[in-house]
Amino acid sequence: MAEADAVPLHYTVTQAQEVPSWDSCEFLDLWFTGMEGARLYAKFLRPRRSEPMPLVLQFHGYPGASRSFAEQASFAGMGMALIAMDCPGQAGYSEDVGGFLGTTVSGHIIAGLDGLPERMYYVRLHQNIRILCRLVRELDGIDTSRVFVNGGSQGGGLGLACAALNPELIDRAAILYPIFERFQARVGPWRGRDRL
């Protein structure tokens, strides 16, 4: 994670191109720079309110992309912000700069297997999620003591890794049928573990 922590934070938050915002909710496009200069995308929605709000980081299943803003609007109705990142090369907007030969539509679990371990697809993806977590700390209006992760399938595995690798940020996790979660890491205790 030290390599990801050394990447300078560059991000933009703009009005979503897909849908207009509502009186009660903002729909935003969040673009940020990840490992190796990758351009990464996440849907960002939040209720229009002045006090700091909790945030859900949501990760999608494999292969796929983040759900539509309309499907996610209920989070704003509950008073929560949501950031749903598109995993690179899996049907969303995030850019895959891995330089791997062959398809980037499937086969991500083995992408980079014949090279250096730190260049494997999922190593880079976990590092990009770490960069996203650093970025979250800078966003206005987010209560960083109430940041949660949510995901199913691949997204469940990413959510577990996100919680384990960012224990000072992630308070709780709602995980469904995780896959790709068995990556070894040296991490400390997760502060939300005793509440599960």
Placement of each model-derived feature along the sequence:
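N-terminal cap/lid segment of alpha/beta-hydrolase-fold proteins
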Residues: 10-50
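Short beta-strand element of the alpha/beta-hydrolase
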Residues: 42, 46, 52-62, 82
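Cap/lid segment of the alpha/beta-hydrolase catalytic domain
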Residues: 67, 73-74, 81-127
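Alpha/beta-hydrolase-fold catalytic nucleophile elbow
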Residues: 86, 150-152, 176-177
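Gly/Ser-rich "nucleophile elbow"/oxyanion-hole loop immediately N-terminal to the catalytic nucleophile
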Residues: 108-148, 152
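Gly/Ala-rich beta-loop-alpha elbow adjacent to hydrolase catalytic centers
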Residues: 151-159
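Hydrolase active-site cap/lid region
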Residues: 158-196
